[in-house]
C-alpha cells in the first residue's frame, strides 16, 4: 500500500515538474525561434522528469527512490540559486551619490541593430546616464560573425541617438563572454581613471554572476536590471546556474 501511494505521489509530482521544465526549455524556441544551453538542459531535465513514472514502474522501488532523491536535491539547489539570483538583482540596485561607471554587457545584434534584449539593457543604461550626467559608460561586446559592426559599436550608436554625448562612451569591442566583458572593461577603467563603483546594465538573471566577477577585480558592483523579453528569463536563469558552476567551481 505504501509503495502504491509513493508511486502515485512521485509520479504526479514528477510529471508536473517535468511539464514546467519542458515549458521553460521550449519557450525560447517556440516564441523566438532560437535556443541556448540553459533551454536545452531544462528540456532534457523535463523529459527525464516526465519519464520518471515509467522508469519507476520498471525499476525496483529502492533504485527509483534513489533516482527521485537525486532529482529532488538537484532541483532544490538549482531553484534556490535561481531564486537568490533574482532577489540579488533587485536588492543591489544602484543608489549612489557619486557618478559611477556604467558597463553595458553585450548581447545579440542583427543587421547593425540591437536585439530586443540588448535594447532593453541600453535603455536601462540610458536611465542611469541621464541621472548621473558626469558618469561614463563602457559598452562591451565583440564582433558577431556576419555582422558589419561590433556589438560595442551598435550600442554606442544607439546611446548617441538617444542623446548621450559620444565622449561619455568608451568602446570595448574584443570580448566574447561575460568574463571578458568585465576583464577588458577593467583595463579601460584603470587606463582612463574612471570610477570603480560599477553599475552593470544587463538582465536580472545576469547580475549575480557579473557582480561576482566585478568583485574579483576589486571594484564595487551595483545593478541596473533591464526587463527580459517574455518567456526568456526562466531558461536563462538555468543557463546562469550552469555558468556559475563552470566559472566559480570548475575553473576555480
Model regions: which residues?
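Membrane-embedded alpha-helical segments of integral membrane proteins
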Residues: 6-55
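A structural signal for short, hydrophobic/glycine-enriched beta-strand patches
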Residues: 68, 80-239
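A transmembrane-helix-recognition feature enriched in membrane-embedded lipid enzymes
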Residues: 234-252
Amino acid at each position: 500500500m505504501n509503495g502504491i501511494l509513493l508511486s502515485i505521489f512521485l509520479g504526479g509530482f514528477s510529471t508536473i515538474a517535468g511539464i514546467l521544465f519542458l515549458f521553460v526549455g521550449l519557450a525560447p524556441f517556440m516564441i523566438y525561434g532560437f535556443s541556448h544551453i540553459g533551454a536545452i538542459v531544462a528540456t532534457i531535465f523535463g523529459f527525464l522528469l516526465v519519464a520518471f513514472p515509467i522508469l519507476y514502474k520498471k525499476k525496483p522501488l529502492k533504485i527509483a527512490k534513489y533516482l527521485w532523491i537525486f532529482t529532488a536535491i538537484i532541483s532544490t539547489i538549482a531553484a534556490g540559486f535561481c531564486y537568490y539570483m533574482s532577489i540579488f538583482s533587485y536588492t543591489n540596485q544602484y543608489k549612489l551619490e557619486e557618478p559611477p561607471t556604467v558597463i553595458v554587457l553585450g548581447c545579440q545584434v542583427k543587421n547593425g541593430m540591437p536585439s530586443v534584449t540588448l535594447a532593453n539593457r541600453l535603455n536601462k543604461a540610458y536611465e542611469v546616464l541621464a541621472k548621473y550626467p558626469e558618469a561614463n559608460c563602457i559598452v562591451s561586446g565583440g564582433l558577431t560573425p556576419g555582422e558589419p559592426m561590433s556589438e560595442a559599436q551598435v550600442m554606442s550608436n544607439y546611446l548617441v541617438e538617444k542623446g548621450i554625448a559620444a565622449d561619455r562612451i568608451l568602446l570595448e569591442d574584443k570580448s566574447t563572454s561575460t568574463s571578458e566583458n568585465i576583464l577588458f572593461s577593467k583595463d579601460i577603467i584603470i587606463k582612463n581613471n574612471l570610477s570603480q563603483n560599477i553599475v552593470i546594465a544587463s538582465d536580472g538573471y545576469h547580475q549575480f554572476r557579473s557582480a561576482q566577477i566585478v568583485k574579483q577585480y576589486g571594484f564595487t558592483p551595483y545593478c541596473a536590471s533591464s526587463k527580459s523579453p517574455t518567456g526568456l528569463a526562466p531558461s536563462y536563469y538555468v543557463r546562469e546556474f550552469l555558468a556559475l558552476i563552470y566559472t566559480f567551481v570548475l575553473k576555480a
